[in-house]
């Protein structure tokens, strides 16, 4: 996005957002509010889209679901109007992740497909890689392993043409880790081995902590299926010792959930509860009932395994209450999606109409006013 046309104050706000988005949430949110307010005053969809997007990104990192959904849906509308396609695709990606977490894979897939379409239309290969990897994870969640592999492999093929991109190594780890997990879940353990070896190649210790923990989770599942108790438990302890108190819960929930399912089959109860104690408050804070239900299901499995009947019944009662509330949430989510799609469709129709009108005017300007013949030969 280019911002040279704006005054010094606006450019300073934008610079502050981009420089601090990973380190200072309060400062970024304050600048985003200023940018949105100025954008409203000047009827500037580009500024409003920018402010809503980066504000939404911060709320995503803070696990603040209510503000995230509002900001990101607003961002999508304004960015589409401003024709800022890279951020439009990133909006679709965020909303796809959130919809999947809410338990609506069909809606998530719709967001991802729109993101893929715009990635192809506007030649955005790195954004396409991002969408393809998350589509692969969606298929993985749904047990569509062939589709999952194909999506990951398509992302890999594009990635090989972008080896100098700053995100190349990040996406390579995502590809190898997710492919390994996909193969492991199908019990194709020998095929998964070379992917795991890549993840542990020289220098992997320099990978970000969250990514190292993801690799440890894949190792836990792999060694559990291999029956290697010692290596499995070593990986479990790595997670237990290094798990931070705060995670971006939507980015990692499915991985930790699958890890917990493995832990329920072991005697590693302390590590199981360590993970639950970290993810549960963040899931509650994000206000995604579907994930709260999954956490409760882990607790119920544990209580049943250890014959803790009173705790099991209490959790079951809460599970029932949340299930009823989740139905209303799903209806509201679909209603919001329908409204958003109508708004985007209306804007795109208006844009196409304007483009056709401009084309007609251009053709007329290129014709002799007397003969109506083209002046260009």
Regions flagged by a language model, labelled:
Residues 1, 17-31, 36-43, 48-359:
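Regulatory sensory/coupling modules that transmit signals to nucleotide-handling catalytic cores
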Residues 1-8:
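TPR-adjacent "capping" and linker segments in tetratricopeptide-repeat scaffold/adaptor proteins
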Residues 10-14, 18:
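Short terminal alpha-helical segments
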Residues 362-377:
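Conserved nucleotide-binding and Mg2+-coordinating catalytic segments in signaling enzymes
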């Amino acid at each position: 996005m280019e911002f040279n046309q704006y005054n010094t104050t606006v450019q300073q706000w934008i610079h502050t957002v981009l420089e601090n988005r990973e380190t200072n949430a309060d400062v970024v949110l304050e600048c985003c509010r200023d940018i949105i307010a100025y954008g409203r005053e000047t009827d500037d969809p580009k500024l409003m889209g920018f402010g809503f997007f980066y504000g939404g990104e911060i709320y995503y990192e803070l696990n603040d679901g209510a503000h995230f959904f509002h900001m990101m849906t607003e961002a999508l509308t304004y960015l589409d109007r401003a024709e800022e396609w890279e951020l439009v695709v990133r909006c679709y990606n965020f909303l796809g992740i959130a919809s999947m977490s809410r338990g609506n894979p069909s809606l998530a897939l719709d967001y991802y497909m729109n993101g893929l379409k715009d990635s192809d239309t506007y030649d955005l290969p790195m954004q396409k890689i991002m969408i393809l990897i998350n589509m692969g994870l969606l298929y993985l969640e749904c047990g569509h392993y062939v589709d999952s592999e194909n999506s990951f492999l398509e992302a890999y093929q594009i990635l090989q043409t972008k080896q100098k991109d700053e995100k190349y190594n990040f996406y390579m780890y995502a590809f190898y880790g997710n492919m390994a997990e996909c193969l492991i879940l199908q019990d194709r353990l020998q095929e998964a081995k070379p992917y795991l070896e890549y993840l542990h190649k020289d220098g992997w210790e320099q990978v970000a902590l969250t990514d190292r923990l993801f690799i440890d989770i894949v190792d836990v599942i792999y060694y559990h299926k291999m029956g290697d108790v010692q290596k499995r438990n070593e990986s479990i302890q790595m997670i237990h010792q290094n798990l931070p108190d705060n995670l971006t819960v939507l980015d990692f929930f499915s991985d930790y959930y699958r890890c917990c399912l493995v832990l329920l089959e072991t005697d590693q109860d302390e590590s199981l509860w360590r993970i639950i104690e970290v993810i549960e408050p963040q899931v509650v804070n994000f206000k995604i009932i579907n994930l709260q239900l999954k956490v409760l299901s882990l607790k119920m499995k544990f209580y049943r395994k250890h014959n803790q009947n009173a705790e099991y019944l209490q959790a079951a009662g809460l599970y029932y209450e949340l299930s009823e509330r989740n139905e209303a949430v799903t209806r509201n989510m679909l209603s919001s999606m329908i409204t958003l799609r109508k708004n985007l469709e209306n804007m795109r129709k208006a844009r196409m109409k304007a483009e056709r009108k401009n084309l007609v005017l251009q053709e007329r300007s290129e014709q002799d006013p007397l003969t109506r013949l083209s002046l260009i030969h």
